[in-house]
Each structure stands twice: as structure tokens, then as C-alpha cells.
Amino acid sequence: MSVSAQSVPTTIACLLGPTASGKTAAALALAARRPIEIVSVDSALVYRDMDIGTAKPTREERARVPHHLIDIIDPADAYSAASFRADTLRLIGEIVARGNTPLLAGGTMLYYKALTQGLNDLPTADPAVRAELDAEAARDGWPALHARLAQIDPATAARLAPNDAQRIQRALEVFMLSGQPMSALLAAPRPADEAAAAYRFVPVALEPSDRAVLHARIAQRFDAMLAAGFIDEVERLRRRDDLHLGLPSMRCVGYRQAWEFLDGDIDYRTMRDKGIFATRQLCKRQITWLRAMPERIVVDCIAPDSTARALDALERVLDGRIAAG
């Protein structure tokens, strides 16, 4: 159904922030005030059997408020931004129809961008093409494939590191399937999308006024994961014949480093240091995405009363007392 000039889009509050910024605490605080259902905006939480390393909400927390898009696929499978977009638009409609309030919460900014801005017409993943590229990478190395990408799509290659296997593979896959550089397809106008036009997405962004404080939280969280049995969790996954480091699930922060430790490639201390560093790099990318959203409502996530501030911002959004600019 088209959104007429008279219809008012439904406001959807979105709680976005980097790792360890307090999203779960703020979401649960809102759940104590309103009948909400949380839709996860997190590419790691979709995987089953990956609980500790993804800092998945506990069973108790998930019992207190309905959560969606958590534990929905096996680690051997893939989940795309397009799938997230379709699932989220469907879920929002179902939650509203139940008389509840949807709250989007997470830190996968690519998913949020796909939801709010739409998707370009890129070809879907092809397992055969990916297997071919994986075999070439095993033989020649990802820097060699990066060099090939630079010849056919210099714009995309210029923004990717030579060892960024996931993105190099995707860019080459797109070219092999479409015959066009991914940069050209991404620059093409997005098709009109009436489904998302029914909603106004308002982001409340949890950002640190002092990044060093957030970095300390990240280190504490990683150590807590290790103490909670993270290495054992990865070992159980590693024993499966159908899982390997080339899969998106095993590229999640921390899992690759723990896997390398279990393989004997690095020692325990190096694994810990690399895991924390990778998490900090993810945090940096997440903050960069957030700061590119001029319409966001910023809450300092390291303030002593950050949960109360985030709760206040979310309630003002939902009450119509504040809106995206």
C-alpha cells in the first residue's frame, strides 16, 4: 500500500551503539516501562551456539522481554543485509499489530543502513563462485585476489585491505556474477521502496565522550568472556566438519583469534591481545558509522547515568517529543 500524503509514518526507535556501550541495559530499562519487543540489529547474534563470544542476551533477559533475530540460523549458513531488511520490516508489522512497541537495538550499522536506505540490486551469494574464490585464495593468497580486484574495480579495491577476505570475495563474486564492478552497482539509484516508507526510523546513538573508557570496558568484557568459557565454546564449533575460518560466522570478532589459538598458531596472550584489538577496531568502525548520521540523538555511553539518559531519549522519541532531524 502506498503511503499517502495524509498518512503519518510510524516512528520506530532505534538504539544503536558500539560494543560494550550499554545497549542491553537501556533496552531492558525501556522494557520495564513499556510493552516492547526487541529486534536485534546484530550480525553475530543471528547464529546459534555462539553465545559467549557474541555477548548474547542471557536467557533471563530474553525471558523478560521478547527478542527477535537471535539464534535464527546455524553457523554454517549465511545471513545477509537483504535478509535482515526483509525480516525486520515483517517483524515490525507483526509487533505493531500485537499492540506492542518495536525497539531496534544493535551495532551492525550495515544492517541499519540497508533497512533505512534500501539496497542496491546486487546479485545474491553463489556458493559455487565462493568456493572457487576460496580455492584460489588458498593457493595464491588474498593479496593476489585483491590485486585482481584492483584491475576490474579499482574504486572498491582502494578501500579494502589486501587481507580483507570477506569483502574482497564479495566484490569479486559480484563482478563474476554481474559482469559489472560492485562500485558501479552501488552508485546506481536505489529502487523506490514503499514498505520502509511506512516508518520513520529515529536513531538514539550511544557514543563515548572518552574512547579510552570504552576500550577499558572492551578489555574487561573480553576477559569476562574468556572466564565464562569462550575457548570451550569455540572448541565445540571447531570440532564440526562443516565450519571453517572462511565462513562469516567464524569471522565474528574473537572467534577467529580463539580458533587460531586452538590451532596452535598463536599463544594465549597473543590471542587475547588480538581479540581485544579486533574488538576495538570494530568499535572504531561502528562509531564512524554513527557519526555519519546527522539525524541521530547522541547519548554519552560512559556517563554515570547513561542508562537513564538513553531511556529518556527513547521515551521522548516514542512519545513524539523528539524526532530525527
UniProtKB/Swiss-Prot annotation:
Residues 42-45, 166-170, 251-256, 284-291 are annotated as: Interaction with substrate tRNA. It is an enzyme of class 2 (transferase). It comes from the Bacteria. Keywords: ATP-binding, Magnesium, Nucleotide-binding, Transferase, tRNA processing. InterPro entries: Dimethylallyltransferase, IPT, P-loop_NTPase. Its EC number is 2.5.1.75. One of its GO terms (molecular function) is tRNA dimethylallyltransferase activity. Pfam families: IPPT. Belongs to the IPP transferase family. PANTHER family: TRNA DIMETHYLALLYLTRANSFERASE. Catalyzes the transfer of a dimethylallyl group onto the adenine at position 37 in tRNAs that read codons beginning with uridine, leading to the formation of N6-(dimethylallyl)adenosine (i(6)A). Monomer. HAMAP family: IPP_trans (MF_00185). This is tRNA dimethylallyltransferase. The gene is miaA.
